[in-house]
Regions:
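Single conserved hydrophobic/aromatic residue that forms the stacking wall/gate
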Residues: 1-13
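Small/polar loops that bind or transfer phosphate-bearing groups
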Residues: 3, 85, 140
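Acidic active-site catalytic centers that drive phospho-/nucleotidyl reactions
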Residues: 10, 68-72, 135, 147
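Short, glycine-rich, amphipathic interfacial segments at transmembrane boundaries or analogous
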Residues: 17-54, 114-133
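A short, structured surface patch at a secondary-structure boundary
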Residues: 48-111, 150-158
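C-terminal terminal-structure detector
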Residues: 103-165
């Protein structure tokens, strides 16, 4: 009974992997459960919007509960991500924001995270410049206590489904 579930889960993860930029700009494959319809352009960097028609019914539930991020524990165990840090972005996002948001690439000074200071202070509701502001605060005050604080602040975000799309 478990085997078909594991195979199905593995296929959902494998089919929805993307390249992101991590610490120092190093590319890595990020793992996620598929929550959107597969795009014809696999690296299509459109931002997700509220009531986005590309999000599937199951994907909506995964995103509301943040379970679509669960496979990123693999990235953490492989040393590509941390529990706390700026969220990793696609290379095309960095290319698009170069020159538009000053110092956006400075986010790559630390390991990207599953959650971050920007996520507990607005997440999807923040524009890239606002996210960068919070990411820079995190980078400049990075500590074990700050990480613990961010993790504790993440709990109500997950359970209240705040900031989910």
């Amino acid at each position: 009974e478990i085997m078909p579930s594991l195979v199905g889960s593995e296929m959902c993860i494998r089919d929805s992997t993307q390249i992101r930029l991590g610490y120092g700009g190093k590319p890595f494959t990020i793992y996620k459960f598929r929550s959107m319809q597969q795009s014809t352009a696999p690296d299509d960097a459109k931002w997700t919007s509220e009531n986005d028609t590309r999000i599937t019914r199951v994907g909506h539930i995964l995103r509301l509960t943040h379970l679509d991020e669960l496979p990123q524990l693999l990235n953490i165990f492989m040393g590509e991500m941390s529990f706390v840090g700026p969220r990793p972005e696609r290379p095309t996002v960095y290319d698009d924001l170069d020159g538009k948001v000053e110092n956006f690439r400075s986010r790559m000074q630390v390991m990207p995270g599953l959650t971050g200071y920007a996520q507990v202070n607005g997440g999807y509701d923040l524009n890239p410049a606002e996210k960068l502001k919070y990411d820079l605060i995190y980078i400049n005050h990075c500590s074990v206590l700050f990480d613990l604080w961010c993790l504790l602040k993440t709990i109500p975000v997950v359970f209240t489904m705040k900031g989910a799309r």
